[in-house]
A protein has these predicted regions:
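Cytoplasmic membrane-interface "Motif A"-like loop-to-helix N-cap segments
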Residues: 76-88, 135-136, 307-308
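Cytosolic juxtamembrane N-terminal segment immediately preceding the first transmembrane helix
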Residues: 1-27
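A gly/Pro-rich, aromatic-decorated transmembrane alpha-helix motif that marks the paired
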Residues: 30-31, 68-69, 152-167
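Short amphipathic helix-loop junctions that connect adjacent transmembrane helices
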Residues: 31-53, 271-275, 331-336
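C-terminal ends and interior cores of transmembrane alpha-helices
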Residues: 86-107
């Protein structure tokens, strides 16, 4: 894994292209979603714009929510690599389902994309971070290159999928299908290049077996122990994850119920079911879940001070960046 491509490790460029094709598929599909619903739908009468935006809002909200779950699953059970592979496969199937342009397959496709994104998005970034655990000074350049792939994929996806999707000679099936084809390319590339990562991204249950078979331990693959970097050891949990999860789930549910009550007290009762779910249920579900998730983390008594401070920093930054992404996602909705 010694760096020999622009001074970076070859594994970084595997992740670069995998993420690039995933972002191609995401933004390529997104640019077509609302336009397809208001112009074509499923061969019946097109949707009202308000309904299309409501569906887009539900989809986008869940796309941003599910990575919290996907990250936990990867950390505790799957490992980052398996999560990325599973997410890429599920998203490929989702794009294929949407390309059929049938109502049931369209909704199934959106559901698969939401689930796949939750598994894929947080965990490929985690693999990028682990590449330079023993060389933290190189991480800035590492992530700069990685995000160049994100931007390149988004640009190409928007250009090509919109061209084929809105072309009279091709149609929306080709636009949605093209997104799936490039997601499949990313999946295949990552699957066959796994050997280059060493032990990085393996599931917790696989690490001991890998180290025993190679005799490498943490020295291979760039993973460093805390003492090797002169850092405090990472906390291992307080053994109360289950009770804390239940307690904060209850708190999150109560908060969600309060937010729901406030929303319906100001809302027009005549809106249809889709808009009702988008406006009444999605905000409290997301807000309640985020509060429960954050509370579950910060209430861990085993957290070191440096870890707790970093968690609070993430929470503060996340709050303010919400407004950026809220405006950014209008590109696929109200600005389409």
């Amino acid at each position: 894994m010694k760096g020999n491509i622009f001074g970076q490790k070859p594994a970084l460029f595997v992740l670069f292209f995998t993420e690039m094709w995933e972002r191609f598929s995401y933004y390529g599909m997104r640019v077509l979603l609302v336009v397809f619903l208001v112009k074509v739908a499923f061969g019946d009468s097109p949707w009202d714009r308000a309904d299309a935006l409501a569906l887009y809002g539900i989809y986008t909200g869940l796309v941003y929510f599910t990575p919290m779950i996907g990250g936990i699953l990867a950390d505790k059970f799957l490992g980052y690599r398996k999560a990325v592979l599973a997410g890429a496969l599920i998203m490929t199937l989702g794009h294929a389902a949407m390309a059929m342009e049938v109502d049931w397959s369209f909704y199934l496709g959106l559901a698969l994309l939401i689930i796949g994104n939750g598994l894929f998005k947080p965990n490929i970034s985690s693999i990028v971070g682990q590449l330079y655990d023993k060389e933290p000074e190189l991480k800035d350049g590492d992530y700069t290159i990685f995000y160049m792939g994100i931007n390149a994929g988004a640009f190409l996806g928007i250009m090509l999928c919109s061209y084929y999707g809105e072309s009279a000679d091709w149609g929306y099936s080709w636009g949605f299908g093209l997104a799936g084809i490039f997601m499949l390319i990313g999946l295949i590339q990552f699957y066959f290049a796994q050997g280059i990562f060493g032990r990085i991204g393996l599931a917790p249950s696989e690490l001991a077996a890998y180290d025993a078979s190679t005799g490498s331990g943490s020295q291979e693959g760039g993973l460093a122990k805390a003492e090797e970097l002169d850092l405090p050891k990472i906390s291992q949990g307080d053994g109360q994850e289950g009770p804390r999860a239940i307690r904060w789930a209850i708190i999150g549910t109560v908060i969600a119920a309060v937010v729901y009550g406030l929303i319906i007290s100001f809302m027009d009762p005549q809106v249809n079911a889709l808009q009702t779910f988008s406006r009444q249920f999605m905000p409290p579900i997301i807000i309640g879940s985020v509060v429960a998730f954050v509370g579950w983390i910060v209430s861990d008594k085993s957290l070191l001070k440096i870890e707790r401070d970093r968690v609070w920093s993430i929470i503060v930054f996340s709050f303010f960046i919400i407004f950026f992404w809220w405006a950014f996602e209008q590109a696929g909705g109200s600005m389409t």
